[in-house]
Amino acid sequence: MASMSTVFPKPTSFISQPLTKSHKSDSVTTSISFPSNSKTRSLRTISVRAGLIEPDGGKLVDLVVPEPRRREKKHEAADLPRVRLTAIDLQWMHVLSEGWASPLRGFMRESEFLQTLHFNLLNLDDGSVVNMSVPIVLAIDDQQKALIGESKRVSLVDSDDNPIAILNDIEIYKHPKEERIARTWGTTAPGLPYVEEAITNAGDWLIGGDLEVLEPVKYNDGLDRFRLSPFELRKELEKRGADAVFAFQLRNPVHNGHALLMTDTRRRLLEMGYKNPILLLHPLGGFTKADDVPLSWRMKQHEKVLEDGVLDPETTVVSIFPSPMLYAGPTEVQWHAKARINAGANFYIVGRDPAGMGHPVEKRDLYDADHGKKVLSMAPGLERLNILPFRVAAYDKTQGKMAFFDPSRAQDFLFISGTKMRALAKNRENPPDGFMCPGGWKVLVDYYDSLTLTGNTKLPEKIPV
């Protein structure tokens, strides 16, 4: 069977607007119209040629030092002032180094930070703009700032004090934590997972500059073979002859409703005239909140789904997206979409309440469930990307399988929430037949069994540095 590092599919659904094929050549042009509430744009139409689209800025950024120069750069790094990276800092460095944030070339300087925070974009030298909705910044404290002094370069080191990167032509500026939190999350309520992990106790200064990463980032956790860079993904997609790439991000186990959505999306793309649409199944691999299923268990579950034939390995590429999860709703989902452009995707699948979470204080969702997909259809810098909102899938009791929800017979459908799914797995109970493949469900049960054995109700996964 095909290796899991080169295959996979997941949930999707399709827009109701017509998609049209150009008959002038073998290439396909999609035209998708989105209604907008903007007074200046009552309708938005996107046209994208078949195949892989250009990365933002026209060229993928690669910030890893070429191998012949690594020894020299390591010697340079040894003599520079040092900034120690946290696990989340390392994940952002990984993101930057491989070009997921192209054309960004390092941790943000103040002008880039302000453009991102206030406008959700970056202005390029040629007058064009690219989407950039979340700040990618590095915090330092007063002591680190003093040690850096007048130096224009610093060495970034891991938890063992080993140099792993150099930051050049640096700029140090104030870290406006409250404003950053308010503008990114839309609230400063206590209990935001990423804020508590990475911002609240971070330094009061930010340091930006051009990044040189001394070696490719490896986690040595048995999953590195799934961590394909944008360059590697594009190479794999071209090798497969993809004429359309539809990306789906997830941080949860795959059930048969997801598979239905994914296969339906591919069917619709084939009906449009595409000959070989490929799914990029792209689970998030960075920081997640404590009650999410850890990455290693999610990847085991995804593999079983593939082995059980729920997903087609020939038309799916499975890879890990190294970004941390912010749970910043419509703001963050723009980042998720933008990064997939750099990986070659021209279609992005978006579901209900993408990148959302429950309000940390009040008993409600933090974000409107429909705002994510609406924002993506209007966001500056994402015009080249076709947005595919989910169709709602639920368990059809009359058919004994996952199916698209039919409101005319709502009584026939059962919605199995993530909370319900976790409760069933924790209690070693089986879901209805047809909800999830048996192999995938067993992985989920085994995960919750492992928590019971350790005496924990939840065992957060340590992120290696």
Swiss-Prot record:
Documented EC number(s): 2.7.7.4
Protein keywords: ATP-binding, Chloroplast, Nucleotide-binding, Nucleotidyltransferase, Plastid, Transferase, Transit peptide
UniProt xrefs under Pfam families: ATP-sulfurylase, PUA_2
GO biological process: cellular response to sulfate starvation; hydrogen sulfide biosynthetic process; protein trimerization; sulfate assimilation
Induction: Accumulates in roots during S starvation, but decreased after SO(4) anion restoration (at protein level). Repressed locally and systemically by phloem-translocated glutathione (GSH) (at protein level).
Organism superkingdom: Eukaryota
Reaction(s) this enzyme catalyzes, per UniProt: sulfate + ATP + H(+) = adenosine 5'-phosphosulfate + diphosphate
Subcellular compartments: Plastid, Chloroplast stroma
GO CC, any one term: chloroplast
Major localization class: plastid
Quaternary organization: Homotetramer.
Annotated protein name in UniProt: ATP-sulfurylase 3, chloroplastic
